[in-house]
Amino acid sequence: MLHAMLLAGRTALVLGFLFTSLADAQDLGNSAARPTMPFQLVSGFLVVVKGQVGDLDGLKFILDTGTSYTMIDRKVADRLRLRRRPGKITNFDRDVPIDWAEIPNLRLGPFQTGAFRVLVAKLGEYSRFAENVDGIIGLDLLGRSKKFFIDYEKQTVSWELAEDRAGAPPSPTYFAIPFIVQGYPVRLILDTGFQGILLYKERLRQRLPNLRTEGEEIEVGMGRLQTTQVKLPGVCLFGPETVATVFLTDGPVTGDLPGVDGYLGIASLKAKRVEFDFAARVLRWQ
């Protein structure tokens, strides 16, 4: 069955659920008329494609809907001799120092950006899963399309391009989708760059001071991210309530991402195909 959820966009407000028809489900698998490129599935969940920055071709990029801004590794910026200015971003529970830079062009599938502002960081410090890639493509580029498709069975990604990009709305900074925990709604960022369900424990306990868990709590390190793995009953994304394995961690130290309670890795949907419909502001999967 194909399910759909409203896309939250910049406000992270979820208005409700949408359900698509069987015809929509059949359309989701038909990519013959769309620009398509293959990807490599890394670590069972990461979508890695090849692209070009400036005159550097064959670079590896993670496609990550949990990242607002496209990033390149410091070594790529060094090779291009880019001028930079300092900044910082929030990565799950901590601030990470980065630089801003402007690249001459980024080519990925149907996209040719021209001059494009990106973040520059040592990606191995940003995420242990990014140690062997050259960049991370965020929603600032993925959101330029009308629709974006991931086919995990065929290991291809494809796009339906907007006819008039000049009149299109700005790309969303993140998706926030509804998630019910023991009767209370929370909002999670949908993240193709994460493999599980991550919840900010203090934000969750503010809403649920009597939060119930089952079994033993296990401390789990994810690179520099320290989490506690628990089994959480009374969880509902769609359909009946279930018991889910989740990871609890501290929230962002700066209080960033207001109204966001964590991240939902797209692997948790166990989807064969996923469609991000930016025009209709809807997520579909089957």
Model-identified regions with their sequence ranges:
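Pepsin/retropepsin-fold aspartyl endopeptidases
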Residues: 23-286
